[in-house]
């Protein structure tokens, strides 16, 4: 016979959360554990299951998730390289993930497809983008209905009909304020414009109005119902915040993996596209971000930051080397548009900065 102790006691003994103990029990990874009502009982001689990575990888987990919008600076092409730098500390388990510049969420959705974090925080300063995340999470049926109606109306039209429809939708989007009553309509317009505008670009003028012209797509997929439903399910336990990246500070601790993907520092005059919103992310903002990273580094969090490599065009530019001299700076290959028109692309280096 075994002497049994509670999940709370074994959690304290193993220095992990009680919820994580329950997950191990449900997966059958704790030998002879048994459930009594709503409580798990564990033999007091049980051995802690070994996690070889900081987060638990499930080889047979979930359907692949994709970003539901295209976003400037999106990390779709870099996900495989980013994954290599997800920290691994043997049995050290990171249970929380934070992405304060979520954008299109390429790494977020890769992580949601493969890993189980107990708590996830995403944020962005773009209120239209965050509204879309919230609507996908909370009102996906209504959203799919509206996007399906838009797709059925827009795709069969000739060019003149499409132009009228597109610019009418753009005017409506710019005029519509986000409220509880308008959130779904605003999100549907946001996604429609993203799928049909030039180069999938999100750009606003000084008044904060979306001003990208219509793109030339033969048969755009405006409503990807399966992906939207899968993303909605995956977001149910994700905290979504609209605001400055510094708001994530209270969430971040020693058990957190943090990925920061801010607006990149321009490497040329034409590459400096940071008009995701009406505010500018200049060198002073890059310095403020570095100070924030210094703060969260003190918490014991594992940190990964992406940015441009100014030495692509100026080998003497040591801006980031000076700013992050206390960190490990890796250079990774990327293919980027090097002007705002998106018609000049090439292989360049980007920086991946880790603590």
Language-model segments: residues:
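Major-groove DNA-recognition helix of helix-turn-helix-type DNA-binding domains
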Residues: 15-41
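S-adenosyl-L-methionine
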Residues: 58-96, 106-107
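A short, Lys/Arg-enriched interface patch at domain edges and termini
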Residues: 44-62
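Class I S-adenosyl-L-methionine
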Residues: 323-355
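Class I S-adenosyl-L-methionine-dependent methyltransferase module
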Residues: 114-236, 274
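Conserved Class I SAM-dependent methyltransferase catalytic core
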Residues: 286-335
